[in-house]
UniProtKB/Swiss-Prot annotation:
Residues 146-198 are annotated as: RGG-box 2. Belongs to the GAR1 family. It is found in: Nucleus, Nucleolus. It holds the Pfam family Gar1. GO terms for cellular component: box H/ACA snoRNP complex. This is H/ACA ribonucleoprotein complex subunit GAR1. GO terms for molecular function: box H/ACA snoRNA binding. Keywords: Nucleus, Repeat, Ribonucleoprotein, Ribosome biogenesis, RNA-binding, rRNA processing. InterPro entries: Gar1/Naf1_Cbf5-bd_sf (IPR038664), H/ACA_rnp_Gar1/Naf1 (IPR007504), Transl_B-barrel_sf (IPR009000). The gene is GAR1. Non-catalytic component of the H/ACA small nucleolar ribonucleoprotein (H/ACA snoRNP), which catalyzes pseudouridylation of rRNA and is required for ribosome biogenesis. This involves the isomerization of uridine such that the ribose is subsequently attached to C5, instead of the normal N1. Pseudouridine ('psi') residues may serve to stabilize the conformation of rRNAs. The H/ACA snoRNP complex also mediates pseudouridylation of other types of RNAs. The H/ACA snoRNP complex mediates pseudouridylation at position 93 in U2 snRNA. Residues 4-29 are annotated as: RGG-box 1. One of its GO terms (biological process) is snoRNA guided rRNA pseudouridine synthesis. It comes from the Eukaryota.
């Protein structure tokens, strides 16, 4: 499942050093050799050329993978997504043209298209509400005998938080903060688990 594998990649940044939608986009880009997808969806409209690339405004409610192939309406490939820019409610992206495509040959308003399997829902990059303070109280009242196990799960939650940090469209926007909170939850989860484990040992 290419889309699922993509969504579990290591980042919504451009290139390896930018946080790695490159990992997902790279795998997606390899599929281009098998031809364009059966159907394509509107991804964005051309705004202007900059440094040899096409700068576009997104007209799709979802977020494109980095390195995702971009097409014209007739499925002619024109390049790949290079960067995703702007706040989550006003997304822009750039297209690195493939050989033979000139960025200045397009005019404002020209549409670009993408395969549906190269998109992620915006919700993946929105901050999640913090759990109510009372949620942790039942764990404390459950007894020390089970504290060690719960502490372990607290650590695991932090582990899941870390990929969100790596996987952030917010590496340059909002998602990075989520990752940070995920990491913070990990550190909090760790001491809670540790203290319970210690208390159990003393018991």
């Amino acid at each position: 499942m290419a889309s699922r594998g993509g969504s579990r990649g290591r980042g919504f940044g451009t290139g390896a050093n930018r946080g790695g939608f490159s990992a997902r986009g790279g795998r997606g880009g390899m599929q281009q050799s098998f031809g364009p997808p059966t159907t394509v969806l509107e991804m964005g409209s051309f705004m202007h050329a900059c440094e040899g690339e096409m700068v576009c405004e997104s007209i799709n409610p979802k977020i494109p993978y980095f390195n995702a192939p971009i097409y014209l309406e007739n499925k002619t490939p024109v390049g790949k997504v290079d960067e995703v820019l702007g706040p989550i409610n006003q997304v822009y992206f750039t297209i690195k043209p493939q050989e033979g495509i000139v960025a200045t040959s397009f005019k404002p308003g020209d549409k670009f298209y993408i395969g549906g399997d190269k998109l992620l829902p915006l919700e993946k990059f929105l901050p999640k509400p913090k759990p109510p303070p009372g949620v942790s109280k039942p764990k404390k009242a459950a007894g020390t005998g089970r504290g060690g196990v719960r502490g372990g799960r607290g650590g695991a939650r932090g582990g899941r938080g870390a990929p969100r940090g790596r996987g952030g469209f917010g590496g340059r926007g909002g998602g990075g903060a989520r990752g940070g909170r995920g990491g913070g939850f990990s550190s909090r989860g760790g001491p809670r688990g540790g203290s319970r484990g210690g208390f159990r040992g003393r018991g």
